[in-house]
Amino acid sequence: MDLLCAGELNVDLVLSGFQSAPLLGMEIMGEDYTECLGSSTAICACVASSLGAATGFFGKLGRDHYGEIALQGLKKYNVDTTLVEISPKYRTGLTVSVSTADDRALVTCFGDTIDAFRQDEVPLERAN
């Protein structure tokens, strides 16, 4: 393994297709949404893998809908996920992005996985 990335894993729920973000107390209609792998560490792993580096990820996911999306997002880019712990005791984190053509607003809930992450568990010997 050329690169072992370790960190939080979460999913982005991106809402789009409107001119401006709603104000508090207001509801607007969007045109589209997408659920995709988020977290800067995971995105770094995917980019490194797509550039040809043998890349793995160490992290934790809930055995839930968002955990499955995150896991499939890593696998889509051939990131080794054998060091990703998946457990029903965790709740996968989520970022909701309200995105317009000019800007975005983000709300992130880390879930339980970031608190369960321990640096001393990272198997550094697995990276070259």
Listing of model-derived features with the role each one plays in the protein:
Residues 1-60, 65-69:
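Glycine-rich phosphate/adenosyl-contacting loop at the front of the ribokinase-like
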